[in-house]
Amino acid sequence: MAMSSYMVNSKYVDPKFPPCEEYLQGGYLGEQGADYYGSGAQGADFQPSGLYPRPDFGEQPFGGGGPGPGSALPARGHGQEPSGPGSHYGAPGERCPAPPPAPLPGARACSQPTGPKQPPPGTALKQPAVVYPWMKKVHVNSVNPNYTGGEPKRSRTAYTRQQVLELEKEFHFNRYLTRRRRIEIAHTLCLSERQIKIWFQNRRMKWKKDHKLPNTKGRSSSSSSCSSSAAPGQHLQPMAKDHHTDLTTL
């Protein structure tokens, strides 16, 4: 009851704060800042007690928040940490050291020396195909010497009119060619020896068919078969005669 009556009867006046608009205009803050900086300059000349030695460098007031106007700033020594809210953030010009950047995962892979790519262990290396001598085409002179694959299917040779005319002329004089003459004709007509040989074989068969001549190969085979069949009968007759004479003598 005594406290409440004292508060009621006292001459306490509520503080009058300026409205927010005055803060935005800067008049109130500007006057207070001038008073604060003036008191800060006055506090720099203040000599503290002899507990801590005075440093050689001059002291500068902080621009940030600090003690109120009229208070002196203590000198900073080597073992004393500055007090106040601004002491936690350091000097205005100083910056916190940035942390070192974390190494990227791809940077390590690039720094390592890259060697030749190794095939996976499950896959085997392809071996070159083996080409045996019988798989090569060597019986034709006009074949590509660099070709090492299998023998392709032979195509029918198309002779030109000039080649056929020269071959017919040669066949009219000689139905059978020697090796030397065959080589000469092959070089003259730009053909191979095998092509010349096959053409002459076919031309001889056609000539025999046109003249109705018997095939020499068929006649020789038939004559040999007849001779072989007649030989056993000749040997059987003397044996039968000898057997008959033996029976009569008995």
Curated annotation (Swiss-Prot):
Record's signal peptide = none
* One GO term of the biological process aspect: stem cell differentiation
**Any idea which residues the entry calls the DNA-binding region?**
152-211
Which ranges are annotated Basic and acidic residues under compositional bias? 240-250
Q: Where is this region: Disordered?
A: 31-126, 210-250
Write down any Gene Ontology CC term. Answer: nucleoplasm
Q: InterPro entries under this entry?
A: Antp_homeobox_Deformed_sf, HD, HD_metazoa, Homeobox_antennapedia, Homeobox_Antennapedia_CS, Homeobox_CS, Homeodomain-like_sf
Pfam families annotated for this entry? Homeodomain
Q: Which residues form a coiled coil?
A: none
Write out the biased-composition intervals (Low complexity). 105-115, 220-229
* Matches recorded under PROSITE patterns: ANTENNAPEDIA, HOMEOBOX_1, HOMEOBOX_2
Motif range for Antp-type hexapeptide?
131-136
The molecular function terms in GO held by this entry are:
DNA-binding transcription activator activity, RNA polymerase II-specific; RNA polymerase II transcription regulatory region sequence-specific DNA binding
Q: Where does the protein end up?
A: Nucleus
| Quaternary structure, from the entry | Forms a DNA-binding heterodimer with transcription factor PBX1.
What is the stated purpose of this protein?
A: Sequence-specific transcription factor which is part of a developmental regulatory system that provides cells with specific positional identities on the anterior-posterior axis.
* Family membership: Belongs to the Antp homeobox family. Deformed subfamily.
Q: What is this protein called?
A: Homeobox protein Hox-D4
Q: What is the lineage of its organism?
A: Eukaryota, Metazoa, Chordata, Craniata, Vertebrata
